[in-house]
Amino acid sequence: EYRARRSCLQEYAKAIDLPLVVRDDYGLRPFVRAVADDIDGRCVKCYELRLYAAAQAAKDGGFDAFTSSLFISPYQNHELLRDVAYRAAEETGVQFYYEDFRPMFRDGQTRARELGFYIQKYCGCVFSEQERYQKPNRILR
């Protein structure tokens, strides 16, 4: 899943001449360690791991701000995601760029299909993949 998403992003970035910073390590072990005691509450830990890493990468790279593609998904807990991102910004001293991209979700999916992009069917974690086969997706608001 991670490799498929990463490869698609790298191809797109190259096609539009977009500089891209990519972590080569998916970080499965740190993620599993972080969520082991509360698998059902894993999303906040995942958000923390991902957004703090993005903020730190922005700081290390001398960027003015950071954001996340997670903000386009209606399937994520948007408010929690935003709160974690602002905490990461405060702790790293790098501005967090906030925009609610959810209204563009369907158009983005359509465009991605037109371009032949890989479209994931779940958030990407192994627990979410399991849930994907157990119950229908629900949209969080």
Model-based region annotation:
Residues 1-141:
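Nucleotide-activated chemistry modules centered on ATP-dependent adenylation/adenylyltransferase
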